[in-house]
Amino acid sequence: MSCGTYKRGSLTFLLVVALAVPVFCQSRTRLKWKTRISTTPEVMVEERALVRNETNNRYVKIYSTRHPKKTAISNATSTIDFEKRKVAIKVRTYVNSQRTEACYLMDPINTHDMTMTVNVIKSRNQTQVIDKTAVMDMVVNSNKLTIDDLKKDYELSRIYKECDKAVVESGLYTIIKGTPSASATSTDPPIDVLGLIPQSGIHSQHIRIHFNTNPQTAPV
């Protein structure tokens, strides 16, 4: 084997490795699940849930920020006029097996951030117990999936496991279901997002939702 042949073979091998590393890293990135600690005094922790939308394969980042010292925050949503389309976010909360729900109009989709505030009032003397069956049915029915589908899908299987975890911890969870409002004029596929956000031991919740329109990449 000549020196030139050896060099060409080495370069080919290095080229293959260089092309394979980004693909491997991207596949690994999709499995990341992070918890970030904020340095802001009013904000204790920011948690992230990554959920895949079955309708149009969009990825959604759901951020929840805890405000343990605040007892009540208005239900007003902050609107950002990026485009004319609005999305109604329906929030269902289970407290002692009793369901309460509220709808919020959100601006807009694509790669922009939106904020909304959800009130969660919790009495220190009251025990919050989540209804596992009701939550499981809600998760399944809202996306028209079966339990087996939840177990097969990586992101949705995390939601499935969180339902079990919620019962063990006797925590309070909010289910977020987003659908287009009646006034939506966009011809894009409907947004249908689902998320479980842990709210055990907190009074109010500030939620930031980010939509990623690229189905090939998940947010990191």
From Swiss-Prot:
Tissue distribution of the protein: Nacreous layer of shell (at protein level). Expressed primarily in the mantle with highest level in the mantle pallium and lower level in the mantle edge.
Q: Which UniProt keywords apply?
A: Secreted, Signal
Protein name as catalogued: Uncharacterized shell protein 11
| Any one GO CC term of the record | extracellular region
Q: Does the keyword Signal apply?
A: yes
Q: Which organism is it from?
A: Margaritifera margaritifera
UniProt keyword Signal present: yes
The signal sequence is 1-25
Per UniProt, subcellular location reads as: Secreted
